[in-house]
Structures are given as structure tokens and as C-alpha cells.
Amino acid sequence: KIYSTKPTLSLAEVILNNTTRILREEFELEFDKSMISNYKEETLDIIPMIMKRCDYNEKVFLSEVFNENISFEFFDAGHILGSASVLINAGGKKIFYTGDINLRNQTLIPKAELPKHKIDILITESTNCAADNYPDYKEETGRLAAFINRVINKGGSVLIPSFALGKSQELLMRVHTLMKKNIIIVLIVTCIITA
């Protein structure tokens, strides 16, 4: 079984099909062509059948998999739609695992939820783990508005490269809000998604 949050399962079909296409193209160009058979679209058809949707904060018991009393629950990681950290209860210990996590509210995604009780082991990605100098949301939005206005007032065009999932939607919402509040002029916004 594959356990996931409901939003992740909803996005999985699109993301997995895209990933499969990219991997097939890369293998055709750079690797042993016999490996391509591992990345067939038909293989993806079984994924929805083996995925189990879980709500955030829903305790899921894995007794059918393990003979021991092992459970887990997802916590919203506040990173992108469907992102989750996981609290695993096993052998009387609490293990909290998280990848990317955001401890501040975004325009579209609320900040991460964390367990309210003591954990025994923390496993985390650490790109910004010890950073305490994150830019202020309002200051960064102000800098974005000033940049856009400066470029547009000089007759230029604004190009903002961004990840297709999560960050693009956040940027579009910020730009929309800035236009709605007349902080920046109304722009023609074009999104180009490339793989």
C-alpha cells in the first residue's frame, strides 16, 4: 500500500504521468534503453488501486502489515498542497519525519502543524533547518511589488521563473492581490509550464 494525504492522491496521477514521460525521455537520451520498460504509463494505472487516502491527524494502524502495534499520522507540512510530515509510533517511541516544512502561513497554504507532544526522534531535511533569518512575508511582497513596478514603468516585461507545483500558485495569488489592491498596475499574466 501507498499511504498519502487526499490532496497528494489527487495530484499523483498528473505528477506521476509527467515524471514517467520525463524519465523515459532521459533514459532514451542518456541511459540503457532496456531500462525504459520500467517507466511505462500502464504501470501507473495500478497506483490508485494501492493508494490509501489519509486525513491529516488521522491515526493509521499498520497491524495488517506488522505484528507489532505500529501507527502513524500525517501532519500538514505547510509546504505545498498535500505535503505532509509523518509521526510514527513504534515500539513505544515517537519518530517525527519531515521533508520540506514551512512554519509561516502562505497566501494559499497554512503553516505547518507540529505534534503537540514530545517526540523521541526527529528526522528532517536541513536545507534551512537552522536558519532564523527568513524574510518577512510583507517585506518580500513589498519588494516584489517594487520590482514589478520598476520594470513595468521602464517599459519592460516581468519574467518570474518558478516551480510548477506550489510556488507558481503562490506567486500568482500574490500578484493578483497586489493588482486588486492597486499596488501594482494590472498585468497580463502568462504561465508557461515546462518539464
Give a label for each model feature:
Residues 1-170, 176-181, 188, 192:
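His/Asp/Glu-rich metal-coordinating catalytic cores
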Residues 195:
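Ligand-binding beta-strand-loop-alpha-helix segment within the catalytic cores
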